[in-house]
Amino acid sequence: MELNTHNAEILLSAANKSHYPQDELPEIALAGRSNVGKSSFINTMLNRKNLARTSGKPGKTQLLNFFNIDDKMRFVDVPGYGYARVSKKEREKWGCMIEEYLTTRENLRAVVSLVDLRHDPSADDVQMYEFLKYYEIPVIIVATKADKIPRGKWNKHESAIKKKLNFDPSDDFILFSSVSKAGMDEAWDAILEKL
């Protein structure tokens, strides 16, 4: 598929099924902890400065945000999880919204699950990965902020993440930096393969 990634726009934000776009376009969902770099990932992948708002305030994305890419596919930005300052009730609401989307959306082709290369995956990261494996949803692990770690230590950090996740070697694992754009081509290859 040829994609003009510059031709991208935020289409709509949705809280539940009735608000989802009603068409056949394939979707790739992006999930990860608050402040893992999801907005930066979207902006880097689409060569845009601030199509997705990067926020210093974690827990800002409270809806599913649908990004139209060249009228051929969509990114769906899922609310960041694991943010402590949000009430338990709010977290449960998000959980239901995310679960409804991930388990019922026919357009969904894969989930890009973002983890921070600098740290071991959190319990939430592990739970998300297990959830996706349980529902047999194709998953691409993207380890962000690779520029913050010396290249010589990438393998060590990658191994630690894979071990903690109980990573399935048939899934894609990509080291990514929105600063250096490392991993951008690999991420696109993995995404397009899933469409």
Curated annotation (Swiss-Prot):
Presence of the UniProt keyword Nucleus in the record: no
Q: Which gene carries the instructions for this protein?
A: engB
Binding of Mg(2+) occurs at: S39, T61
**EngB-type G domain segment(s):** 24-195
Q: Which keywords does this Swiss-Prot/TrEMBL entry list?
A: Cell cycle, Cell division, GTP-binding, Magnesium, Metal-binding, Nucleotide-binding, Septation
Q: Can you name this protein?
A: Probable GTP-binding protein EngB
The family note in this entry says: Belongs to the TRAFAC class TrmE-Era-EngA-EngB-Septin-like GTPase superfamily. EngB GTPase family.
Sum up the protein's function in the record's words. Answer: Necessary for normal cell division and for the maintenance of normal septation.
> Per its UniProt record, what Pfam families does this chain match?
MMR_HSR1
Residues bound to GTP are 32-39, 59-63, 77-80, 144-147, 176-178
Q: Which HAMAP family is this protein grouped with?
A: GTPase_EngB (MF_00321)
Q: What PANTHER family does the database record attribute to this sequence?
A: ENGB-TYPE G DOMAIN-CONTAINING PROTEIN, MSS1/TRME-RELATED GTP-BINDING PROTEIN
Q: Which residues form a coiled coil?
A: none
**Cofactor(s) needed:** Mg(2+)
Q: Which GO terms describe its molecular function?
A: GTP binding; metal ion binding
One GO cellular component this record assigns the protein to is: cytosol
Q: Which GO terms describe its biological process?
A: division septum assembly
Species source reads: Streptococcus pneumoniae serotype 4 (strain ATCC BAA-334 / TIGR4)
What InterPro entries is this protein classified in? G_ENGB_dom, GTP-bd, GTP-bd_ribosome_bio_YsxC, P-loop_NTPase
